[in-house]
Regions:
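Glycine-rich phosphate/diphosphate-binding loops that line cofactor/substrate pockets in enzymes
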Residues: 1-10, 76-78
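Glycine-rich phosphate-binding loops that contact phosphosugars or nucleotide phosphates
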Residues: 13-151, 157-164
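Residue-level preference for well-ordered alpha-helical positions
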Residues: 33, 121, 161, 191-195, ...
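Internal, active-site/partner-interface "lid" segment
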Residues: 154, 158-194, 200
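NTP-binding/hydrolysis catalytic cores, primarily Walker-type P-loop NTPases
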Residues: 194-228
């Protein structure tokens, strides 16, 4: 609800994390754009050293106390935005520093951590603590901690898009039509929701003209004489 409130004000959601958590968060920002047809600026990720470091093992960057805040300032962060931090240990300097800067600037924050009573949880306005316990390989938080963060992240971003009206029923009616698979899925969703339209090729032309299932339905509603 807190994130939704910020987005309604025209704000953005920023994910901030290092290692596994940061990479999973960045993946989510990419996936939600296509699945829900949103602009890439609505949900963004902040990663140590910048997004260009995602595929490189420069984990020392997570000790930088100012890099994350500087990245946010470059994006003109404001009180209308929301920052969600990720840290398995709950102590990552990069994330903790960002949350502290946000608090000073009056920017609301949340976090997902995997240890109880962690400094990052104490610094966030809306902490989520998922206590996963020791990893099978000690310290390798890409396992249980990373998996739990991915599930919580999915819950947050999915419920947020549902509440914004980007999903109807359980269908991606706003998905971007960027390949044959998604175009075909959009056609099948449209025909399932509108069984009176049975000509697949004509539906496909309509979908491509409109840009999404939802826009196609709106187009039909406004122009009932369309040949479909």
């Amino acid at each position: 609800s807190a994130i939704e409130g910020q987005l309604k004000k025209g704000g953005r959601l920023f994910y901030a994390g290092c290692g596994t958590g940061g990479r999973l968060a960045t993946l989510d920002t990419i996936e939600v754009q296509n699945t829900y047809g949103i602009d890439g600026s609505q949900i963004q990720a902040i990663f140590p050293g910048g997004i260009g470091c995602l595929t490189q093992t420069r984990e020392s960057r997570e000790d930088d106390l100012e890099n994350g805040w500087h990245q946010l300032c470059d994006k003109h962060i404001s009180k209308h935005d929301f920052v969600l931090g990720f840290s398995a240990s709950g102590t990552t300097p990069f994330v903790l520093a960002i949350l502290k800067h946000c608090k000073e600037a009056g920017i609301p924050t949340g976090c997902i951590v995997n240890n109880p009573h962690a400094p990052i949880a104490q610094a966030a306005d809306y902490p989520v603590e998922v206590i996963t316990g020791p990893e099978f390989v000690t310290g390798s938080t890409r396992m249980k901690a990373g998996s739990s963060q991915k599930m919580i992240l999915d819950m947050i971003s999915t419920s947020l898009q549902i509440r914004q009206g980007r999903v109807e029923g359980n269908k991606m009616v706003n998905a971007k039509l960027i390949n044959h698979k998604l175009i075909d899925r959009a056609c099948r969703i449209f025909m399932e929701r509108n069984p009176e339209y049975t000509d697949y090729e004509k539906v496909k032309l309509l979908i491509l003209k409109a840009g999404s299932v939802k826009k196609a339905e709106k187009l039909l509603k406004n122009k009932s004489d369309l040949d479909v």
